[in-house]
Amino acid sequence: MGPSCPVFLSFTKLSLWWLLLTPAGGEEAKRPPPRAPGDPLSSPSPTALPQGGSHTETEDRLFKHLFRGYNRWARPVPNTSDVVIVRFGLSIAQLIDVDEKNQMMTTNVWLKQEWSDYKLRWNPADFGNITSLRVPSEMIWIPDIVLYNNADGEFAVTHMTKAHLFSTGTVHWVPPAIYKSSCSIDVTFFPFDQQNCKMKFGSWTYDKAKIDLEQMEQTVDLKDYWESGEWAIVNATGTYNSKKYDCCAEIYPDVTYAFIIRRLPLFYTINLIIPCLLISCLTVLVFYLPSNCGEKITLCISVLLSLTVFLLLITEIIPSTSLVIPLIGEYLLFTMIFVTLSIVITVFVLNVHHRSPSTHTMPHWVRGTLLGCVPRWLLMNRPPPPLELCHPLHLKLSPSYHWLESNVDAEEREVVVEEEDRWACAGHVAPSVGTLCSHGHLHSGASGPKAEALLQEGELLLSPHMQKALEGVHYIADHLRSEDADSSVKEDWKYVAMVIDRIFLWLFIIVCFLGTIGLFLPPFLAGMI
């Protein structure tokens, strides 16, 4: 008989199994002869078993009895048309990570599987009342349940733990596994987001006519779940599905578990949201700083630089995806535009603040709106001008006769009186003497009836020195009036700058408030806060 003969090969395999399973000693003579591969399984006669054997020997005999001629590659059904019903359940031990960038969820789970194998039945009374036995899973038939939406790593179970056999033929197998499943991450409401990640389990090669799945429980077992510091499992339910794929004509069953997980936002609130709100508040305070303060533009630039550095630091925190813009990303972009606009507006306000009549002319609409109605709407009350500015300068410097009389030099006054008397006798006015009326008008060289009329009206005749002095006084008065007018216009420009600052102060407060509400309101309405 050649080595290629099937009978010889079968005999060789049985001999090897017998040598491996037979303990040392002379037990071979007490064992029943090996069965042929085609013989049906039958329990040995109780009379052939030693009655006083130990539990270890009994378990050893049971092991040999079960796997004598057992084929682990064939489905455990009496007829090929029968269906193996696999009861499937899932228990999660830990939610390890949710990778937003690579769109996958890493979990540590236990796959609970249970089916019936008619070839692994025995009568407990024949084997010392042993009702269950634990055997290596590599020695029995196991369903090829895999994770359909696997993203990285092994699709099937890699750690082949032992299976638990029962005398009724029921096989219970709970292997642990670490899976990286694909998950469509939606970071629209980050960091107040809620994700729906699914895990789809099913047989890879057997269709529904060969293996059918049945759920042990409708929900995922969370009894042994270790709480995550970043995510909380809101709900985890399983559904049974049957689907026909394009590759095959058969229908394949699967059990899909949907994990509703919610991100815990405390870390991002402390390290992301609150700093953004504080930077926005600093931007608002820029418009409350007086324009004559030299640190106004410095504060704007400092806020912008701090925001830029802050954005560089949090690039690793924000999910790096281009599918959608996270809500916090929109808020950061809004804050950046907010600060940039504040710098532009501050430069414009400083330009308005330092305007003068020599460089700019204030338009009438600016004077009517920004100096008239707008301050009243903003509840701004401009203080009235000082009291001395309300009276013209020439009223205080009125060159009346009595005023001049009290200030003219006594010697000069005597000379003037002598000249008046001397020329009055002749009926003339002194030619070298001018006159000053009580209204401040200077007349020089008046004579004849006109001079007499002027004297009757109370005019004072002045010398050339007094004439020059009064001209100087008038020049100074005109110059002071011009300076007062220029100063008034400058103050108007400064007040216009203050009004513009106040307008943007309220505008930025409203925009900052609405932006903050826009950050928290959508996830609040969606029930994520």
Swiss-Prot record:
The chain crosses the membrane at residues 265-289, 297-315, 331-352, 503-521. Residues 353-502 are cytoplasmic. Residues 1-26 form the signal peptide. It holds the Pfam family Neur_chan_LBD. PROSITE patterns: NEUROTR_ION_CHANNEL. The keyword Cytoplasm does not apply. Residues 27-56 are annotated as: Disordered. It comes from the Eukaryota. Keywords: Cell membrane, Disulfide bond, Glycoprotein, Ion channel, Ion transport, Ligand-gated ion channel, Membrane, Receptor, Signal, Synapse, Transmembrane, Transmembrane helix, Transport. GO terms for molecular function: acetylcholine receptor activity; acetylcholine-gated monoatomic cation-selective channel activity. It catalyses: Ca(2+)(in) = Ca(2+)(out); K(+)(in) = K(+)(out); Na(+)(in) = Na(+)(out). SUPFAM superfamilies: Neurotransmitter-gated ion-channel transmembrane pore, Nicotinic receptor ligand binding domain-like. Component of neuronal acetylcholine receptors (nAChRs) that function as pentameric, ligand-gated cation channels with high calcium permeability among other activities. nAChRs are excitatory neurotrasnmitter receptors formed by a collection of nAChR subunits known to mediate synaptic transmission in the nervous system and the neuromuscular junction. Each nAchR subunit confers differential attributes to channel properties, including activation, deactivation and desensitization kinetics, pH sensitivity, cation permeability, and binding to allosteric modulators. Neuronal AChR is composed of two different types of subunits: alpha and non-alpha (beta). CHRNA2/alpha-2 subunit can be combined to CHRNB2/beta-2 or CHRNB4/beta-4 to give rise to functional receptors. Both CHRNA2:CHRNB2 and CHRNA2:CHRNB4 nAChR complexes are heteropentamers with two subtypes: LS (low agonist sensitivity) with a (CHRNA2)3:(CHRNB2/4)2 and HS (high agonist sensitivity) with a (CHRNA2)2:(CHRNB2/4)3 stoichiometries; the subtypes differ in their subunit binding interfaces which are involved in ligand binding. NCBIfam families: LIC. PANTHER family: NEUROTRANSMITTER GATED ION CHANNEL. Belongs to the ligand-gated ion channel (TC 1.A.9) family. Acetylcholine receptor (TC 1.A.9.1) subfamily. Alpha-2/CHRNA2 sub-subfamily. This is Neuronal acetylcholine receptor subunit alpha-2. It comes from Pan troglodytes.
